[in-house]
Amino acid sequence: MKKTLATLTAGGLLVATLAASHQGATGIVRDRMDGMVAMRDTVRDLTPMMRGRTEYAREAVLDAAAALERHAGETMTALFPEGSDDAASYARAEIWQDWETFEAMAMRMEVVAGALAEAADNPPGSAMPEPVDNSTMMGGGPSMMGGGTATEPDPEMLAQMPVDRVFTVAAQVCSACHTQFRAARN
């Protein structure tokens, strides 16, 4: 009974938080917020499996990869036209000031999502580590995930990796982009 009540309370808080977080967002800002929520939920739902806490399900990985890919690349960048940084948006001005890096990260997510689908047949190699402070690796500096002068991830190499490691790369791309281009919530 207590567990059910806690679950219902948590679910209610999540719905209220989502409603409040999108309050006032309309049009393209609302569309991109909805896309980001879909990506966040995809990563959240797959994380226990990638950490070895639930049974591995190839179809769930394929569905997750498709969801990430559907919201990445040009689909993502099209939702950030200049002038769409209204008060309801968490988008920082740096997106438009450093469009090349933002666009590269969106394209990188598309590549990594495709590689995640390809890696779905590869058994998990090691459980995804618990979150650590990756601010140096995933920030705005020249690193594989943070943009700059580093080489782009090789889709063929990623596709050969254990699926949980490719998932970790996808999560790192999300984190790097948010670190550089997303304003903190109030």
Region annotations inferred by a language model:
Residues 8-16:
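Bacterial N-terminal signal peptides
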